[in-house]
From Swiss-Prot:
This is Protein Syd. The lineage of its organism: Bacteria, Pseudomonadati, Pseudomonadota, Gammaproteobacteria, Alteromonadales. Keywords: Cell inner membrane, Cell membrane, Membrane. Belongs to the Syd family. It is found in: Cell inner membrane. It comes from Shewanella piezotolerans (strain WP3 / JCM 13877).
Length: 215
């Protein structure tokens, strides 16, 4: 079990919700990216959405390299949230709306996530704003879900702006307040985002960042 028990519970409930509702594991358009999460002996090169289930990592993924690169100490929850499992993005319902929580699909995806996190933190520094790190997005407009690096609280954040609406005092509390959303996988057509990027959620975040840089 990770140091975020609510995440362990959510991941278990997520799988069960799909099994109970659809009679199968959740599906994900992996875009030819191999992962330990893939269920069954299938061709990863397929264009079809693949069934998946979360996998506990043998060695916890850590963000020490990000801390070293930025000379910044990150809140410990970042390692527990991103480094304890491999999984696809997690769709949720909540009192604040529907959205997705980001997870690492594989080790290569985890490393790509670290690079995106460096970009986000560098942007915050450039804007002279307090450091935050993202965990997901809401479906409503351009609202990111970010963690305040100083105290671990969870907020709504619009790209280019400081955190605006506090959602929970801690990441564990926030995850406890959201519930799995059973929905078909969405295959996004990526015209300007490289194929190796994390499907879907990365596209949305990068569009937000690019719009900001263009201002």
């Amino acid at each position: 079990m990770s140091s975020l028990p609510a995440l362990d519970i959510f991941l278990s409930d997520y799988q069960q919700a799909y099994l109970d509702t659809l009679g199968e594991h959740p599906r994900y358009y992996a875009q030819q990216q191999a992962s330990e999460c893939i269920v069954g002996d299938v061709d990863v090169e397929t264009e079809e959405a693949l069934q998946w289930k979360s996998v506990v990592r043998v060695d916890t993924g850590r963000f020490d390299n990000v801390e070293h690169a930025l000379e910044l100490s990150l809140h410990g929850d970042i390692n527990a949230f991103y480094g304890s499992h491999f999984a696809a993005s997690l769709m949720f319902d909540s009192q604040w709306g529907t959205g997705e929580l980001l997870q690492a699909w594989s080790q290569s995806d985890f490393e790509h996530l670290q690079q995106n996190m460096i970009g986000h933190l560098m942007m915050k520094k450039k804007l002279k704003q307090e450091p935050t790190w993202f965990i997901g997005v809401f479906d409503d407009e351009d609202k990111m879900i970010t963690v305040n690096n100083a105290d671990g609280s969870v907020w709504i954040e619009i790209a280019g702006q400081a955190q605006s609406v506090k959602l929970a005092d801690s990441l564990n509390s926030f995850i406890s307040e959201v519930s799995p959303r059973v929905a078909p996988p969405v295959k996004l057509v990526e015209e300007v985002i490289p194929a190796y990027d994390h499907p879907g959620i990365w596209q949305r975040m990068k569009i937000m960042w690019r719009n900001l840089l263009g201002k």
